[in-house]
Amino acid sequence: MRLHQWLFSLLLFLFVSTQAQAADPQIEILKNNMAQLQQSMQSLRNNMSDLKMTVENQNEVIRQQSIQIAGLRNERGTAAQPSQSGVAALPSGIQKAVGGFNPDIAVVGTTQAKLTQNKSDADGNNAITLKELELNFSQVVDPFSRMDAVISFNDSLETQNANIEEAYYTRWGLPFGFTGQIGKFRADIGKENLLHAHQLETVDYPFVIRDFFGDEGLASSGLRLKNEIPNPWDLPLEISGEILRGNNGNSFSGISRTPIFDTHLKSFFQTTDDTNLELGLTTMFGDENPPLRVLNGDGTFTDITRSQGTDRFGVKIFGGDATFNWFLPEGKKVVCQNELYFQNRTDLVHLNDDPWGFYSLVDYKFSEKFSTGVRFDYLNPLDVGGGHGTTSVSPYFIFWQSEFADMKLQYTHTVPAGGEKTDNSAFFVVDFMIGAHKHAVQ
């Protein structure tokens, strides 16, 4: 009897051990399945976020097209009747759609904390400042046009002031498929110049942009025309041409009556299912205003800057830009962005007659909320001769709190041209936004 009990116990032990060993692979399989399910859920969340942005953009397009359709239907049914003032009245459909003052309004703020080895009491050095506050307005004017305006305020060290950053009227549907814009806008050159400061990955514009066009890039009053160029390869090929007021931009005469002309050509290539490449070319022409040297009675010379400007088209700027995008699983993304500019000019205004510069930026968004990157700058500046160059390295880290707020941390190591002292700076920037903004913070 005891033998039977012992045999039964042995068989039961072997059976349980066998089942436990068989269960181990099943548990591992379940763990792997759970991990894959979690990855799939994260991917779905990222896709839902992208779809939400797409739907919002499409709703804006549908709203504008509905206004156009309503206007066209009314134009077919009834001709516009003259008003008491003798000016033709808008069709009733358009009046209902755009008659009221109901623009999209947004407020965007940028606050910066900066520590630097630079001992000058310049704006923002070793201080916390409200770098900029933007007030944005945009609205469809009628079925054929819209208006956009950006007014900025700053907490300047010397004088607080308001500035019209952009205010322009857009008219689409012009002959031959052109779209026109008139007013004040950011010049359509390269990549970074088109962006407002809070849209940049870094806390400041690249050195070559600041040296050639100003600390905030080039924005000026003028006229812009854009169109798509048909081609046998069926590639997206866009060209824009601008005539800008000449009193802006460090490289030009600074005189309103001598305009700046520029063109920008860009194309887009879908290299693989997960990668694409955007290429662009820029040309700019403008006047210099070299001083007139006058001989005094005592034998000395005086340099006089002439108000009418001289040296027609003495400034020629050429540039190229290349942006590579790589879309990774789970919403991750790598961006490699590069811009190069060089000038051909006399040395009568600035010390350097062949200034040039470039930057290369690599940005890695490794999660929905975080990204990091580094920007390298090289600049052979306008006002330093002898072929001396400025180099700078700027690693940064960004926390994307939401579409409407972000926080940036950046360190910049700069070796200036001309033997000046090396500078190290640290920045902490917070961007925040309320309202309906046409370009998101992120």
Predicted regions and their residues:
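Bacterial N-terminal signal peptides that target proteins for export
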Residues: 1-8
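Bacterial N-terminal signal peptides
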Residues: 8-17
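N-terminal periplasmic/intermembrane-space "pro-region" immediately following the signal or transit peptide
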Residues: 21-120, 439-442
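Outer membrane beta-barrel
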Residues: 90-249, 255-274, 278, 283-285, ...
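Outer membrane beta-barrel transmembrane domains
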Residues: 116, 350, 363-365, 369-414, ...
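Outer-membrane beta-barrel "beta-signal"
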Residues: 225, 399, 422-442
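Detector for outer-membrane/organellar transmembrane beta-barrel domains
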Residues: 274-382
